[in-house]
Amino acid sequence: INGDAKGTVFFEQESEKCPVKVTGEVTGLAKGLHGFHVHEFGDNTNGCMSSGPHFNPQGKEHGAPTDENRHLGDLGNITATGDGPTAVDICDCKITLFGANSIIGRTVVVHADPDDLGKGGHELSKTTGNAGARIGCGVIGIAKI
């Protein structure tokens, strides 16, 4: 992840039927919640803005990770303590590293503000979670481990 927020995040999935484990660390975050999403395009030519909207191949509304009606890329929030790196530890059953809806080649984005999980009543709640500016992003690639 590069930008005002920086870090390394790993996406692991043992098989198509298993959830994706998302782990890593992000630095440069103010204390509090920060929206954490997979966006549609693996394009950072104009910084994080070129990554497009949240990855949403099923055309659903924005929601919480536990909601049935959510973008595939809606991974909720990560919590920064303000003391050192922010740990990322997410297990998600909707995203995948396999098939047509794979997130490989797309962009993970960290936002400046909390994701209201589609429940904030703001005009952006049902599209972006009103999570604010994109302060860090990186293309999801394949790593040799």
Swiss-Prot record:
Key words of the record: Antioxidant, Copper, Cytoplasm, Disulfide bond, Metal-binding, Oxidoreductase, Zinc
CDD domains: Cu-Zn_Superoxide_Dismutase (cd00305)
Catalytic activity: 2 superoxide + 2 H(+) = H2O2 + O2
Cellular-component GO terms for this entry: cytoplasm
Binding locations of Cu cation: 37, 39, 54, 111
Molecular function per GO: copper ion binding; superoxide dismutase activity
Note on how the cofactor is bound: Binds 1 copper ion per subunit.
Record-linked SUPFAM superfamilies: Cu,Zn superoxide dismutase-like
Taxonomy, superkingdom: Eukaryota
Residues the record lists as binding Zn(2+): 54, 62, 71, 74
EC number: 1.15.1.1
Essential cofactor(s): Cu cation; Zn(2+)
Disulfide links within the chain: 48-137
Entry keyword Disulfide bond: yes
Membrane recorded as keyword: no
Subcellular location: Cytoplasm
Gene3D superfamilies documented for this protein: Superoxide dismutase, copper/zinc binding domain (2.60.40.200)
Subunit structure: Homodimer.
PANTHER family reported for this sequence: SUPEROXIDE DISMUTASE CU-ZN -RELATED
Task performed by this protein: Destroys radicals which are normally produced within the cells and which are toxic to biological systems.
Family per similarity comment: Belongs to the Cu-Zn superoxide dismutase family.
Protein name (Swiss-Prot/TrEMBL): Superoxide dismutase [Cu-Zn]
UniProt source species: Drosophila busckii
Gene name as annotated: Sod1
